[in-house]
């Protein structure tokens, strides 16, 4: 019974942590990675992975939802493309 309560509490805390956050995913030319990353706050560090075209990278991060309106135009100006914004259910 105690384990079940702890499990529910963990999931509730995770849902509360995600309440004011969104995830951003974008494509970035490899040459523009540093300027784009410098704009991004994140929980730790953004996730970066190579696309099939090695001159491009996929970048994913979590940010405060209130910052997105100002952040997306700056990311675009720094070279990011194909920017996706999506809600989070939980952050553990």
Question: Can you annotate each of these PLM segments?
Answer:
Residues 1-92:
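Small-molecule-sensing regulatory modules
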């Amino acid at each position: 019974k105690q384990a079940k309560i702890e499990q529910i509490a963990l999931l509730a805390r995770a849902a509360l942590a995600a309440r004011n956050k969104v995830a951003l995913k974008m494509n970035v030319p490899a040459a523009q990675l540093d300027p784009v990353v410098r704009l991004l706050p994140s929980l730790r560090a953004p996730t970066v992975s190579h696309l099939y075209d090695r001159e491009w990278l996929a970048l994913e991060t979590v940010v405060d939802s209130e910052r997105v309106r100002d952040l997306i135009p700056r990311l675009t100006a720094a070279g990011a493309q194909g920017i996706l914004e999506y809600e989070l259910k939980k952050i553990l």
